[in-house]
Amino acid sequence: MDKIPVETLIKDLNLEVIVEAKNNKIDITTSDVNRPGLQFSGFYEHFAYERVQIIGKVETTFIEQLPDDVLAERADRFFNYPIPCLIVTRDLNIRQEIIDAAQKHDRYLLRTKEASTKFINRLINYLDEKLAPQITIHGDLVDVYGIGVLLLGESGIGKSETALELIKRGHRLVADDAVEISKISEDKLQGSSPEIIRHFIEIRGIGILDIKTLYGVGSVRNSMNIDLVIQLEEWDEDKYYDRLGLEDDYIKFLDVKVPKLTIPVRPGRNLAIIVEVAAMNHRQKQMGYNAAHELNKKLLKQIGN
């Protein structure tokens, strides 16, 4: 999503509407915020008006000391800029001059009971998630031992069946068939399911299953960071498959690299157990231990002797 209507922000963060913008609504396009203390003192160089504006206790204390005519002039100048909204924290009093200026320029004036720091943190996290670059891919996403495992492969390769077996073994489904991937930071991806198919899984020969109803709320989750990608493919006798794990492979989504494993599929292989072990091995690597490297060191040491 590249922009958020202020109405959505009001609903999701439970904000009180003091003045509603009716004909001059401006969407939010950045997760950055601005505290306009300098603007109410008359300084407008480098004013980031495109951001959500937030006034807390410090700014309110300064504003309370301004004469009525001075505040009216400064509020009029402030709301003349195309700001998405002004939010007052701590349920603080809002002077009439600010309300009048917001009404005159048809800008949103909002209020929250939360303290400034707590609210700003919540707001930035919310905006980062909503405004994150996003793509949708075909696959399954499962929480395996706290590792977000994205299963990829051709249709019919067994992604959904593997996910179902993992759920039966106590792991949690995030998404089946369609995975929405969001870039939540420079090096992190988060996956989720489209709302309409959330918690559902399709198994050929059976149909649609409601995992939340069948296995309980502990078998699903709404979103998960993507830590590991497992590509399932038909076993190819002529293709070389890594048997040691000394070399790392990666795949890119939204310019973020994610570790990738390619698992060949053939009758008799228990894919769910392989995925479990892959997730545990990935966690072990995150903790600084690589079994393949340790074995390689031992072999080199033995050869050296």
Swiss-Prot record:
It comes from the Bacteria. Residues 264-269 are annotated as: Important for the catalytic mechanism of dephosphorylation. Catalyzes the ATP- as well as the pyrophosphate-dependent phosphorylation of a specific serine residue in HPr, a phosphocarrier protein of the phosphoenolpyruvate-dependent sugar phosphotransferase system (PTS). HprK/P also catalyzes the pyrophosphate-producing, inorganic phosphate-dependent dephosphorylation (phosphorolysis) of seryl-phosphorylated HPr (P-Ser-HPr). HAMAP family: HPr_kinase (MF_01249). ATP binds at residues 153-160. This is HPr kinase/phosphorylase. The active site is at 138, 159, 177 (proton acceptor), 243. Its EC number is 2.7.11.-, 2.7.4.-. It holds the Pfam family Hpr_kinase_C. Mg(2+) binds at residues 160, 202. SUPFAM superfamilies: HprK N-terminal domain-like, PEP carboxykinase-like.
